[in-house]
Amino acid sequence: MTFSLDALARQLRDAEQSGQAIAPLRDILGVDNADAAYAIQRLNVQHHVAHGRRVVGRKVGLTHPKVQQQLGVNQPDFGTLFADMCYGDNAEVPFGRVLQPKVEAEIALVLKQDLPHADTTFDELYNAIEWVLPALEVVGSRIRDWSIGFVDTVADNASCGLYVIGGPAQRPAGLDLKQCAMHMTRNQELVSSGRGSECLGHPLNAAVWLARKLASLGEPLRAGDIVLTGALGPMVTINEGDSFVAHIEGIGSVAARFVAAGEGDRDA
């Protein structure tokens, strides 16, 4: 089957703009065609940059073993973070900003050094971290009914929608990122829990994978980049009016409320 990567990239952009999700791409691309899926993601990143959006980092997705098993994959994926996706702690986020939104609690990193090597080690990654922060990632899918396989989510910018950064910002020394417990509430009811070890065994393992992958592609992580390392527990569906608070033991907390269109304010 022949297909146009540009046309498929445009379909995803149109879905985001119109709020109308599209059919899965895997039947067109082939279920194992990761190269084409990343090419579509790259085309859309290039389009957005050309139209004034600013890249500020990357996210790692598919870090939880149960999610990998569900999609039949044995590796994470990555997506691109833009400045206009970022909200501050306790933000009021327009509910309609992300299609079919769900939320995850994660650990975010801010880097102080470039990571140009495809064999980046755990220690090199650790020493490149300036700040560790709690975060919420709002994932969404431009694919109808979240009917996604690996290539669907990769092409769709790893299902990234927006992210909320909490506090405090801390140096990594002394933090137990592996064993830290996470609890997230929706409207004061516990809806998700987990710990750092559920993210590829350690959140920094996810960051090491990302650093190696991007360096091998000639697009290495740079000083100043934000990295979302992946979910610490199950993702949860968002409904209009919901308030979420995530506490990550020893790391901090982050909160957001999802409001009707026109009410929210972005803190980019």
Curated annotation (Swiss-Prot):
Entry keyword annotation includes Lyase: yes
EC number: 4.2.1.80
Keywords of this entry: Aromatic hydrocarbons catabolism, Lyase
InterPro entries in UniProt: Fumarylacetoacetase-like_C, Fumarylacetoacetase_C_sf, Hydratase-Decarb/MhpD_sf, Keto_pentenoate-hydratase
Cofactor dependence: a divalent metal cation
Reaction catalysis annotation: (S)-4-hydroxy-2-oxopentanoate = (2Z)-2-hydroxypenta-2,4-dienoate + H2O
GO MF annotations, alphabetized: 2-oxopent-4-enoate hydratase activity; manganese ion binding
GO BP annotations, alphabetical order: 3-phenylpropionate catabolic process
Official protein name in the record: 2-keto-4-pentenoate hydratase
Organism: Klebsiella pneumoniae subsp. pneumoniae (strain ATCC 700721 / MGH 78578)
Gene transcribed to yield this protein: mhpD
